[in-house]
Amino acid sequence: MSQSPIELKGSSFTLSVVHLYNSEPEVIRQALQEKVEQAPAFLKNAPVVINVATLNGDANWKELQQAVTAAGLRVVGISGCRDERQKRAIARAGLPLLNEGKGQKMATPEPAPAPAPVVDPNAPAKTRIISTPVRSGQQIYARNSDLIVTSSVSAGAELIADGNIHVYGMMRGRALAGASGDTQCQIFCTHLGAELVSIAGQYWLSDQIPSDFVGQAVRLSLLDNALTIQPLN
């Protein structure tokens, strides 16, 4: 008997979730484009889930999808929809509806970031230091610098740095070093349990991290444009 050409299996993936607080497509496009420009190596063409839990009233779902795509992201589904009329409208637009776990909490919106200062490319890079726990739903971004976290990083939290990332605590969230494309950046963890690790756009999900290194002190870097991992001595 010949083998079937396909096989369906269940799996899980770590995806970024875009929480919408406005239904105007152009407003959404501009806001997302700013985010993508901050970390192009990781976000450009990245798959995302759109959470619409806070949107009230009608929206043009096709135009919203086009706005997200125009910003450089790819919509894989819609979450947070509880209104049946809204669900039907989303389905008519050809967008998949995703069910969330019962215990899942919606991340609180981040305050609008202050305008970025002009960076002198010849100035020495500074280091951003976080000495408190990074909670689920939080995102920390170290622009043009290294990021050091001296506490734990919860699952669902995200660390992004244009430079290196150091975590001196339990690392359960996502760590994205070299976000602006610097392939020389590295990630250092004293206790690795990450959902995702990435350097200059090359990434591993949790199930791709070699099991011998989970829970250990490690250093991640790029070799021939591929992630490598070794003990941190």
Swiss-Prot record:
Belongs to the MinC family. Keywords: Cell cycle, Cell division, Septation. Interacts with MinD and FtsZ. One of its GO terms (biological process) is division septum assembly. Cell division inhibitor that blocks the formation of polar Z ring septums. Rapidly oscillates between the poles of the cell to destabilize FtsZ filaments that have formed before they mature into polar Z rings. Prevents FtsZ polymerization. Residues 104-124 are annotated as: Disordered. It comes from Serratia proteamaculans (strain 568). Signal peptide: none annotated. The keyword Cell cycle applies. Pfam families: MinC_C (PF03775), MinC_N (PF05209). This is Probable septum site-determining protein MinC.
